[in-house]
Amino acid sequence: MSFYNHKEIEPKWQEFWAKNHTFKTGTDAEKPNFYALDMFPYPSGAGLHVGHPEGYTATDILSRYKRAQGYNVLHPMGWDAFGLPAEQYAMDTGNDPADFTAENIANFKRQINALGFSYDWDREVNTTDPNYYKWTQWIFTKLYEKGLAYEAEVPVNWVEELGTAIANEEVLPDGTSERGGYPVVRKPMRQWMLKITAYAERLLNDLEEVDWPESIKDMQRNWIGKSTGANVTFKIKDTDKDFTVFTTRPDTLFGATYAVLAPEHDLVDSITSAEQAEAVAEYKRQASLKSDLARTDLAKDKTGVWTGAYAINPVNGKEIPIWIADYVLASYGTGAIMAVPAHDERDWEFAKQFGLDIIPVLEGGNVEEAPYTEDGAHINSDFLDGLNKEEAIAKMVAWLEENGVGQEKISYRLRDWLFSRQRYWGEPIPIIHWEDGTSTAVPENELPLVLPKTSDIKPSGTGESPLANLTDWLEVVREDGVKGRRETNTMPQWAGSSWYYLRYIDPHNDEKLADEDLLKAWLPVDIYIGGAEHAVLHLLYARFWHKFLYDLGVVPTKEPFQKLFNQGMILGTSYRDSRGALVATDKVEKRDGSFFHMETGEELEQAPAKMSKSLKNVVNPDDVVEQFGADTLRVYEMFMGPLDASIAWSEEGLEGSRKFLDRVYRLLTTKELVAENSGALDKVYNETVKTVTEHIEDLKFNTAIAQLMIFVNAANKEDKLYVDYAKGFVQLIAPFAPHLAEELWQGLANTGQSISYVAWPTYDESKLVESEVEIVVQIKGKVKARLTVAKDLAPAELEKVALADEKVQAEIAGQTVVKVISVPNKLVNIVVK
């Protein structure tokens, strides 16, 4: 019995593709271009898992399909290779993170090649390669020149025991560090910031121009968080000081009964009374120990301290107490709020807790019982009484501007991008700080500023990165003898991934980031496929850098990625006990179709869950390729369900995909192929070409594969197979199962050439309709025969065919036919007596 021998066939074709540079990017000016991009991976020590190939297979199917359609296709792969795990590994082992990273990349590349992806490896990029990060640094120097990169004192998550600051994501909910479990404190430190806020409006508006999932656009809109309102100035009683609050509801100013400053607000120390100084200092200390996330948790208890100072409400001259509370963040808005407890839940709870006034200014509800957060006519509001929300806002803004105590303001939730890390393993920031107090960017002709090699990667202890320990690299002298010190912060991992798609277009250019004509030819990216977890940060940062490069005249488009698609997650199998606790798969046994805990004997419930090392349910693609073959893995992952759905991995499903490929192999290697078309498969073949073509375009790969299965079933019922249909079918399955298709193609075409550039099959519209139909023959109202006849046969012809049928003749023998009623394409009714 013949079957698809993946262990022989797959390596053979992978070698052929590599040797012949089959997937080198086309440069034919007569052809249209298609750019298919994957989110490049961080090369971790764990290697690929089966979730990675889902997105990669999708872009690969599109790339192979477009090549066959006559496109130049750019389908590259590279490595987002700076990152914290490599630095931690280096600190733990004393090994060079570059060596660790290189080993991981080699392993990832081996795994990727084993899956038969049609990448153009001549365009491979690696964010840790100085020839690559020369241009990451170049972009930074341009941002610096334009005033979009600047230094600021910013509170960071400082861990004294680790001698370094850590990212928000590395702080555990209990306020300790993920690594080591040490206390984390908020400490102001000099940091580099990028002024992404300068692009807020464009980042928002240009979302209308791209074909992205609406859910992702909404996440970006919410992150940018545009709101229209007013800035209002509050004077502080008995001082010449004031502070500004931003509010989206200036119409409720008459209901502002207290103000709250962030504990870090510049004014706090200078306005605090002597009696309150101790309480304020202690509260500030406590707040510094909490993360922003913990501080703004809606469910947490309301805490705060009165400063002893009062502000003057500008609309009615009333004195209102100024408090500090940790739910107000210095980094958000102006770091100060006016509180209207009658109409805001958080303000109401705070006011109730501390016995502060609650004055309703909107009609409706009982504000002693609960805040009223609906709209209503204004009350207790002097010149706004009786007005609705829109009218009142407009009137109040006009009043504030007229009286010089406020103005209309558009505000954004978006903050500037904290761009520096106190780490070794990142791109050096190309800035020198001179002893005369000035700073300059490293000149372009001296880029890249190469990350110095060191075997001693340990925190400096001062809050600077380990680069501060490397004095030979650190200290520089200008031609005029002025001494300087290099910037010791490095860039975040986001830097290299914010522009990598541009470098793929021209990866070996030493003179510029990429050639303008090539950028014009390939941008924007036609399809970008990756996980939804990058919905906000990576995609927003890449859009920001792209717009900046557009303003510089480097790139020709406003947006980088025309179409974005998020593949779903491949879930593992997990088991839960009666308490809902997860049980690792190696502690589970299967008996009589049920699952039991090996140690306790308790019956367990099976449920899908995210693959994780702790649950021991991670599936390694190497094992799947070894047992079933790469084509099986590709077909299975595309057939599991819609590309954007999250679906549980199933061994049975994998076996089903393997059986399908074996059936394809048998059909095309054992069925007699003929040059004469009997017409039996005309409809199903043309339907298959049409469906597969349309569904690949729409990324509906599961239904495309289902149609291929329909063709195989139909072809298996025939004694012979028309050779042109056999060839067309192999071309249709090639994007999904390329190794199998190449092997079968050589048997059919015998050209020695790859199937990759053979023109995609077309379908004949006229063959999509049936040429024959089945009709029923009724005698005395009962069905006595079913006949296949030509479609649209005339009633008289239909009658002839029915009466000539042997079965019908036997039924009416010895009887007189009184009447025959013929309905084309449906039935013949014979009345006898």
Swiss-Prot record:
Record motif 'HIGH' region, residues: 41-52
An example Gene Ontology CC term for this record: cytosol
Enzyme Commission no: 6.1.1.4
Pfam families with a match to the protein in the record: Anticodon_1, tRNA-synt_1, tRNA-synt_1_2, tRNA-synt_1g
Keywords of the record: Aminoacyl-tRNA synthetase, ATP-binding, Cytoplasm, Ligase, Nucleotide-binding, Protein biosynthesis
Motif 'KMSKS' region, residue range(s) on this chain: 610-614
Key word Protein biosynthesis present: yes
Signal peptide range in chain numbering: none
GO molecular function (one): leucine-tRNA ligase activity
Reaction(s) catalysed by this chain's protein: tRNA(Leu) + L-leucine + ATP = L-leucyl-tRNA(Leu) + AMP + diphosphate
Cellular location(s): Cytoplasm
Bilayer-crossing regions: none
Positions with a binding annotation for ATP: 613
GO biological process: leucyl-tRNA aminoacylation
PANTHER family per record: LEUCINE--TRNA LIGASE, MITOCHONDRIAL, LEUCYL-TRNA SYNTHETASE
Family the UniProt entry places it in: Belongs to the class-I aminoacyl-tRNA synthetase family.
Protein name: Leucine--tRNA ligase
Species annotation: Streptococcus suis (strain 98HAH33)
